[in-house]
Amino acid sequence: MQKTAPRPLPARISFLSASVLGLGAAVASRGAVFVSNILLAHSLTVHDFGLFSYAYVTALNLGLFLATGVSQAAGHVLPLIENPERKRTQLCAFIVLLMALIAVAAAALYLSSASISVAAFGSEQGSGALRMAAIVLIATAFTQALQSFQYAMHEHRSSATISIGAAVLLLTMLWAMGPIRQPALALTIFLAVNAGAAVSQLLVLARATPSQRGPWRTGREELRLAVKHALPSVLTTSMGAPVHWICLSMLAAMTDGAHQLALFSVAFQWYIAITFIPATLGNLALPFLARHAGATETTVRQRFRSALLFGGGLSLALGCASFLLAGEIFAWFYPAEYGSAASSMRSLSVAAALCGVSVLLQQRIAAAGKFWRNFAMAAVYSVIYVAASYLALRLGFGATSIGLAMSAAYCCLILFQTLTLQGDSGAAIRLGRSFS
């Protein structure tokens, strides 16, 4: 039987083209989630929206730190591998590692949902939503990581197509279902959309890595390499999303915890809208920076400076705009019950502007292979974040406490990151050619 010719590898595109495609996809996906939360804030009661937000943020944060950690390691390793067969087996190793980590996290959340609900709300009122969130976690984490894998494999166009399609599907389902009255139903819709996107991404990656032995085979050496690079990266991201969830749990433990969570959640959507641009640029920039192994420091600096000026500058501009317009935004887009969330939005606007700079500095350090240094700085950030959140909550700042704590922690983190990069300014990026 005649064998089908393997699909040619996608041509490498410029960083500008990759940025345009990545940002377009991010605008579509984040925009859909953003609009969805506004719709749910109108259809759900404030209490139920608080339960939904806590459950969804739990799934998103626990899944996000695993997805970001593994995909950051993949974005560092895969662009350095020239052999297509070896690149395919290494990609499979990262996918296997991701599946194992997600399975453990989802099982832990599902089994402990009642305990978490009691700790957060004083009763099991949120346990059902948290159990659904454990299933949502699997799909959301997979979708986030597989998108970064597509970037590392130069499948930017396919990634953009899937993201835009998922965004359209999410809004269509919410419109077709009419007003949503139950948090579990809203979580089910998010689950269906993310699951469909994950399946589509797997099919694209399978086509992008053809092999005579099948698309999903790997080896012990590839798994060892995946664990070696993913471990410090996952530990670093564990200092972010799970720590943020801990701070939200402290907020939920207040007397009116569900109400405070609802106020914070509607404001936090604007934080995400501001920070997704530098986050997307960071995911796109890492493979490009890593691919310049052995390049002059001047070349790498120029590429990094372009991403920093655009992503960080835009975050600063959007942060200032949202800070000044917070009152008007909540008067225009949300029911009157959410008016007091404007103060939370102002504190989060400051944090978002700082985050836009920090995330790009983190990727610059990761591109140099210094994952453990990122972990050390992230650990310091986490301690400051939790301590500041606890202090602000004790002082009675309510939902505004999280934004204030994040701002303080990001200020310290940016200082440490800047000192780290200045200390290495005289050396070229050395990633080695052991992957070639």
Swiss-Prot record:
Topology in the lipid bilayer: Multi-pass membrane protein
Alphabetized UniProt keyword annotations: Cell inner membrane, Cell membrane, Membrane, Polysaccharide transport, Sugar transport, Transmembrane, Transmembrane helix, Transport, Virulence
This protein's record includes keyword Cell membrane: yes
Subcellular location(s) of the protein: Cell inner membrane
Cellular compartments per GO CC: plasma membrane
InterPro entries on file: Poly_Biosynth_Transport
Source superkingdom: Bacteria
Free-text function comment from the UniProt entry: Probably involved in polymerization and/or export of exopolysaccharide EPS I which functions as a virulence factor. May play a role in export of EPS I or its intermediates across the membranes.
Family: To E.coli bicyclomycin resistance protein (BCR).
GO biological process, one term: polysaccharide transport
Residue ranges of the TM segments: 20-40, 49-69, 91-111, 133-153, 160-180, 185-205, 234-254, 261-281, 307-327, 341-361, 375-395, 396-416
Stated name of the protein: EPS I polysaccharide export inner membrane protein EpsE
Organism, as annotated: Ralstonia solanacearum
Presence of keyword Cell division: no
